[in-house]
UniProtKB/Swiss-Prot annotation:
The name this protein goes by in its record: U21 glycoprotein
Function statement: Plays a role in escape from immune detection by associating with and diverting properly folded class I MHC molecules to an endolysosomal compartment, effectively removing them from the cell surface. In consequence, surface class I molecules are down-regulated and infected cells are masked for immune recognition by cytotoxic T lymphocytes.
Keyword Transmembrane helix: yes
Membrane topology: Single-pass membrane protein; Single-pass type I membrane protein
Gene label: U21
Gene Ontology CC, one term: host cell endoplasmic reticulum membrane
Subcellular location, record wording: Host endoplasmic reticulum membrane; Host lysosome membrane
Domain of life where this protein originates: Viruses
Length: 433
């Protein structure tokens, strides 16, 4: 037994790693870092093992407002997060060289083996996260996986101790991982570049934001940078996986009412797709039509989930029914969420307007019905009386009454008598015709 134990220890020492029985638990994250007014810039590089292609990724967040995470070859739209990330493209290039050219093949082999040990084999992330603040700086080296769009992160954080300018490994962040510590040792020569880049980004942040405002406003005059919308109602559905969610909510802002569709979960900013449909009235039918989203994009939360979102203005569409479709582009699965009904105030207004129109219609209908019923009653009365005194006497009575009440009807009565009572002299004499 003792010999076997010694042999196991020697074998473990040669391999350089003791694999734990289970993977480290997922950490809760350091969300307070963003809320404390820090800027975060996350830069990732990974190889798609199916295609063999190297891909780069970046995301930025300021003051708890997550802006955007995009690929290296993504189209740079007019979003501040994208603008900030791709202004730092040199960091992408250096991380690419560092992770896949500088790091020894033995260390990468251990990292890949560690990933396979935890059941991840589809894609492998290696991420460097730079966190900037006045009193604290940190770099997090992460290894992530996107199998089935579920978050599986093995991460070790290193914080800079300001008192003696030394690095401290936070082993309790998500558990000790010797492979990542070894990989970090090889990356340590690059940390000063990352810190200087981080400090420089903080200094020019306000300048970049001002430049973004000028550029964005020149392309979109309706862009509202400081609006604070209020949510009215929301509906959501979970995807087949527990960590994916599709929601559709109705908002009210200064520029009117609008709807926001969000597809959230780990990895959906790259593998997720959303579409918004509106029911449009035609001449004889209703048809569902794809709505062009005025503002759309994907952004990555550094401490929570990825989110793909789209926004439409409801004031520009006549239809009352909308739904959002969230699709996993890799598997083809989708979820459909219907937009909630209109807000209470607008519903009350529409109800009041409808009630007023309905009351007017009811009064008009009652008056028409009364007139019709009166006419029917008169006709029935005339027919009933004619059975006893004869039709000639009734008509005679009507003509005499009209002639006495409205003398100006003489010409009309003369014509009627000539047509219906030719030769009846008694009627002519009585009417003085």
């Amino acid at each position: 037994m003792m010999i076997c134990f010694v042999f196991l220890c020697v074998l473990t020492f040669v391999r350089g790693e003791i694999y734990p029985s289970t993977c480290p638990a997922l950490g809760a994250g350091n969300g307070e870092a963003v809320r404390s007014g820090e800027m975060l810039l996350e830069i990732s590089a990974y190889r798609n093992w199916r295609s063999g292609k190297m891909e780069l990724w970046g995301s930025a967040a300021v003051n708890n407002q997550v802006f955007y995470g995009g690929m290296e070859d993504s189209q740079i739209e007019y979003d501040f997060g994208k603008f900030l990330v791709f202004r730092c493209f040199q960091v992408f290039h250096n991380v690419h060289k560092l992770l896949f050219n500088t790091v020894s093949s033995a260390t990468m082999h251990l990292a890949r083996k560690r990933v396979q040990k935890c059941g991840h084999g589809k894609m492998t992330f290696i991420s460097i996260q730079v966190q900037c603040s006045v009193n604290k700086k940190s770099i997090r080296l992460s290894r992530m996986n996107e199998t089935n769009l579920k978050k599986q992160v093995l991460r070790v954080a290193f914080f800079l101790d300001g008192s003696n300018n030394s690095w401290i490994a936070d082993k309790n962040f998500q558990g000790e991982d010797r492979t990542m510590l070894r990989l970090w040792t090889e990356l340590s020569t690059y940390r000063q570049y990352l810190i200087s880049s981080c400090n420089n980004d903080v200094k020019v942040l306000s300048e970049l934001y001002g430049e973004f405002r000028r550029m964005a406003l020149s392309y979109d005059e309706e862009l509202k940078l400081n609006f604070m919308p209020v949510i009215r109602s929301s509906s959501e559905r979970l995807f087949r996986a527990d960590d994916l969610k599709c929601s559709f909510s109705r908002w009210l802002g200064a520029e009117g009412e609008f709807a926001v569709c969000e597809y959230s979960g780990w990895g959906v900013s790259k593998l997720g797709k959303i579409e918004i449909f509106a029911e449009e009235p035609l001449t004889f039918d209703m048809v569902w039509k794809t709505v062009k989203m005025r503002s759309s994009g994907a952004y990555t939360s550094l401490f929570r989930d990825d989110v793909t979102w789209g926004l439409i203005s409801l004031d520009k569409w006549v239809g009352d029914k909308y739904f959002c479709m969230c699709t996993n582009k890799e598997s083809g699965d989708n979820v459909i969420v219907t937009l909630p009904e209109k807000n209470v105030e607008k519903s009350i207004q529409i109800y009041n307007e409808g009630s007023t129109m309905l009351a007017f219609a009811e009064i008009t209908s009652i008056m028409v019905n009364l007139m019709f019923m009166g006419a029917v009653a008169v006709c029935v009365g005339i027919l009933g009386i004619s059975c006893f005194v004869g039709l000639k006497e009734i008509i005679y009575f009507i003509f005499v009454s009209v002639n006495s009440m409205w003398p100006f009807c003489n010409k009309l009565l003369t014509t009627a008598v000539n047509c219906f009572f030719k030769g009846r002299t008694f009627l002519r004499r009585e009417l003085k015709i």
